Amino acid sequence: MKTVQIKDITVGGGKGLFVLAGPCVIEDYDRTLAIGKRAKEICQRLGVPYIFKASFDKANRSSFGSFRGPGLEEGLKMLASIKKELNVPVVSDIHSIEQIEPAAEVLDILQIPAFLCRQTDLVYGAAKTGKCVNVKKGQFMAPKDMENVLNKMKETGNENLMITERGFSFGYNNLVVDMRSFPIMRSFDYPVIFDATHSVQLPGGAGTKSSGNREFVPNLARAAVASGVDGLFFEVHDNPEEALSDGPNMLYLDQFEAVLRDLVAIDKIVKG
């Protein structure tokens, strides 16, 4: 398997787990930074490479009035400051080709949301920057179909590519994770990430917003790591009940270390 370079972090190629973690969306600077600091400290204690994540804009909220974040310009300023303060790589979603250039000036990983994974101009344009690109598999996509997404990006010559499993639509307002997707997608020779928190989301399950079952996050994450997944994606918060987006499927920061410690132990057994 190919390795991918993200600043001074090398991932894939049979190396140990790496983690992308942070709040769903930038709520305010101080709280977002504080969450990132705690997540970094936890990962450092466990010897896990850490990448900070937070969205500057949640463009696909269930309702018009839902909180979306600070937006592109202000959000990128905050992410640049957090990146400097924590001295870690940062990742965030991009939603349109117009966002690619300014986002690439700040972000170490350009992330393509699941709903947009088939948008050729977006995935090609992101890869063309030369930055690492992480594409989330659509909730409507077979694992094998993600090879086509990778091939679009490979046309640019960029090999710093990753793909993420985040669940598959199973009836209305429900997602399931097919564990076969991990060996299938890893056969494409690029690092594969498991989004452990969005995979327990119940899309639109609360009427004007999504719900979720965070109690299943540890179970699914353990199964994914046992299958040999390369990285893990978590949304974490000091108090998910107060979170302005995706609270029901986010992990409490107080739970994060215990969950991750188990996953590191499993990963060491699997990868020797």
Set out the residue ranges of the language-model regions:
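N-terminal amphipathic alpha-helix/helix-capping segment at the start of soluble metabolic enzymes
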Residues: 1-19, 77, 268-272
